[in-house]
């Protein structure tokens, strides 16, 4: 189920000029996910604030049962529970989130494991943790 979802997100991001990179973090990136795990995505975009304000992009991937916004410093997350049972956290960050030297929070998230889905600007190509 999540594989098709990730493919759909990648296609959307490839076609969307506002999206610079998409990565998976958390248990799916580490390969420790269980049937109850949510999918944690980080989306690098210079349009973070606009996407937080207008969350319609989340509707492109399925029918929504519930949606909430969560604030974590440089990352604003839109957590979505889809009617098909998937729970997805879209972490929206500005490109400065990946600026070197990485801040402590970014370093922790990435050190725990990440998987690049799309990297138009090659932010993750030579990233040293």
Q: Model-predicted segments: where are they?
A:
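Conserved NTP/Mg2+-binding pocket subregion across the NTase superfamily
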Residues: 59-129
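Conserved NTP-binding catalytic cores of kinases and kinase-like/nucleotidyltransferase enzymes
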Residues: 7-12, 25, 44-69, 76-77
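Short linear sequence motifs
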Residues: 5, 21, 50, 54, ...
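Helical scaffold of the NTase/Pol beta-like nucleotidyltransferase catalytic core
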Residues: 1-23
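Short secondary-structure boundary/capping segments within folded domains
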Residues: 13-15, 31-35, 79-80
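Short glycine- and Lys/Arg-enriched binding-loop motifs that mark or flank ligand-binding interfaces
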Residues: 22, 27, 81
């Amino acid at each position: 189920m999540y594989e098709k979802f990730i493919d759909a997100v990648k296609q959307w991001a490839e076609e969307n000029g506002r999206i610079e990179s998409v990565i998976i973090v958390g248990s799916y990136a580490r390969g420790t996910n269980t049937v109850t795990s949510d999918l944690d995505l980080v989306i690098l975009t210079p349009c973070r604030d606009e996407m937080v304000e207008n969350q319609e992009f989340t509707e492109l991937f399925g029918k929504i049962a519930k949606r909430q916004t969560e604030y974590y410093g440089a990352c604003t997350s839109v957590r979505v529970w889809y009617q098909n049972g998937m729970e997805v956290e879209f972490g929206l960050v500005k490109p400065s989130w990946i600026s070197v030297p990485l801040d402590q929070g970014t370093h922790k998230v990435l050190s725990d494991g990440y998987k690049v889905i799309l990297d138009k600007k090659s932010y993750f190509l030579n990233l040293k943790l």
